[in-house]
Amino acid sequence: MPHPRRYHSSERGSRGSYHEHYQSRKHKRRRSRSWSSSSDRTRRRRREDSYHVRSRSSYDDHSSDRRLYDRRYCGSYRRNDYSRDRGEAYYDTDFRQSYEYHRENSSYRSQRSSRRKHRRRRRRSRTFSRSSSHSSRRAKSVEDDAEGHLIYHVGDWLQERYEIVSTLGEGTFGRVVQCVDHRRGGTQVALKIIKNVEKYKEAARLEINVLEKINEKDPDNKNLCVQMFDWFDYHGHMCISFELLGLSTFDFLKDNNYLPYPIHQVRHMAFQLCQAVKFLHDNKLTHTDLKPENILFVNSDYELTYNLEKKRDERSVKSTAVRVVDFGSATFDHEHHSTIVSTRHYRAPEVILELGWSQPCDVWSIGCIIFEYYVGFTLFQTHDNREHLAMMERILGPVPSRMIRKTRKQKYFYRGRLDWDENTSAGRYVRENCKPLRRYLTSEAEDHHQLFDLIENMLEYEPAKRLTLGEALQHPFFACLRTEPPNTKLWDSSRDISR
């Protein structure tokens, strides 16, 4: 297979910011980014429940088969909410069959056919970066596979700068590869290569816009959000260069047989997470997709010990320094807020009930994440709104009547109470696998009770009563980690990066 063709690209500084270039494009008129991105997010979230990689089977008569802790794993750099079916649907069925047939018969005729297919696909997408003027005329040596992934090999160079070392992961959005950045003195970086599919490219553009503004606000990378080094368009593939990080906190948990993190590690990881997301909130930005998959260790090296009682090896991460990643769904306060946000298991009740959302929905997600670190499994393992609300009531108590009166989703309620039958298969599942929050405590030690007090306040039903992250950082559970006086800010929030 031919290798990607090399092109020299101008430095990022010479082409201006992503936002400036995006606004200056002379293509045909299109809808505003905030409208189009939000509608895309809405479509994506509305379909999430049917295809998310961690979904359980639908209700049946075999409740014993519905395991609360069964979490299927997608070995990608980050988990995302696009389905494989939606990614493939970009291509016509006939095109996919033809492509696969010709790949099996690797002849000169198949190569010409493949080029014609690439030309047809290129007419359906638009290039973006000024430095990628060559991209509008795809080089004969650059090919995509049937799903739109760039075909590459170890040792290939991109932009005469990035030398591919290995593949770190693959998702429906694209692939992430480890590269040597020869313009940064041989620094190892993670390069996200987005599929040559317009909806994924648009999501990447939105993420770039947010990351550039975060970089402007936090040039020294003190606020624990992943650092973007560079971006470019390589023959229709949006590429984003990031600092190279370790495994996600979910991947490490899975590889460790879902053994919970020790409480001192939970404390440090939770403290950093609150710091990073508070930085976003102070600058009028809501992440909207916080989950263990989107929190990565800076270095996931570990020590291995053998547990005689359980007769298995157990891993303990050496450093709990983390970074928050994946800003593709992040939303500024002034932007349109789509109805549904967040991955199901970390979705706040105001989102489920369509009461509107803002920064407190991130706090709810953080509460769910901290719980998962502590016990090793997801708090709300479901993909159905009614069942999700039933789990909340079983664990946290009744949904407030004020929220019930305000919601448009009255189909979930009857006479001011959740319409839920505990004698069904779903009802038995919730009753057998969910219990009041405090009953998940594994120790009666004071710091364990402090942790659950923090989680309870983060999982307050009503957003206005929910703990803010500024308050969370002052919680007694974090007392041993606080090095700054209570009123000292870790950053200057007087500047607004939202515009």
UniProtKB/Swiss-Prot annotation:
Post-translational modification: Autophosphorylates on all three types of residues. Phosphorylation on Ser-34 and Thr-127 by AKT1 is induced by ionizing radiation or insulin. Phosphorylation plays a critical role in cell proliferation following low dose radiation and prevents cell death following high dose radiation. Phosphorylation at Thr-343 by PKB/AKT2 induces its kinase activity which is required for its stability. The phosphorylation status at Ser-141 influences its subnuclear localization; inhibition of phosphorylation at Ser-141 results in accumulation in the nuclear speckle.
Compartments it resides in: Nucleus; Nucleus speckle
Gene3D superfamilies named among the record's database cross-references: Phosphorylase Kinase, domain 1, Transferase(Phosphotransferase) domain 1
The entry's keywords: ATP-binding, Kinase, Nucleotide-binding, Nucleus, Phosphoprotein, Serine/threonine-protein kinase, Transferase, Tyrosine-protein kinase
Residues annotated with Phosphotyrosine modification: 99, 152
One CC-aspect GO term: nuclear speck
Main location (coarse class): nucleus
Domain (Protein kinase): residue spans on this chain: 163-479
Activity control, per UniProt: 5,6-dichloro-1-b-D-ribofuranosylbenzimidazole (DRB) inhibits autophosphorylation. TG003 inhibits its kinase activity and affects the regulation of alternative splicing mediated by phosphorylation of SR proteins.
Binding positions for ATP per the UniProt entry: 168-176, 192
EC number, UniProt record: 2.7.12.1
Region (Disordered): 1-65, 102-142
Active site: 289
Pfam families associated with the record: Pkinase
The keyword Transferase appears for this protein: yes
GO BP, one annotated term: protein autophosphorylation
Free-text function comment from the UniProt entry: Dual specificity kinase acting on both serine/threonine and tyrosine-containing substrates. Phosphorylates serine- and arginine-rich (SR) proteins of the spliceosomal complex. May be a constituent of a network of regulatory mechanisms that enable SR proteins to control RNA splicing and can cause redistribution of SR proteins from speckles to a diffuse nucleoplasmic distribution. Acts as a suppressor of hepatic gluconeogenesis and glucose output by repressing PPARGC1A transcriptional activity on gluconeogenic genes via its phosphorylation.
Subunit annotation: Interacts with RBMX and UBL5. Interacts with AKT1.
Name assigned to this protein: Dual specificity protein kinase CLK2
